[in-house]
Amino acid sequence: LNIGTNDATFVMLSEEPEKTEQLFEEKYRNFLKLLRQLNGSETKIVCALGSIDYYLYDRICSAVEKYRKETQDLKVYTMKYTKMLSMGLDVGSCFHPSKSRQEKMAEELVKFLKKQVIE
């Protein structure tokens, strides 16, 4: 998963950002439960964030930690992509990651999977 970047803007602009962050974390944890239910107990899930923004990364880590404690499901991991540069080759359309940045992200993910996930 790599979700939460666009949610950061919604959270920051909400009337009560702290409550909205808590709600995001709760909904993220519920989403993990649904993913597990739909994909079975053997599926490994990587909860990533980046490379544009990390505003909700701590909330994602907290959601994963709470989920793991609650369910004893140790096949859920967190990963933080390297932050992209705000100018130059990293930037594509509408300030989203360019093709070359996405290729770098794919390399990061493969390295993470080999080191942390694949047994």
Named regions from a protein language model:
Residues L1-E119:
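Alpha-helical cap/lid subdomain in secreted, periplasmic
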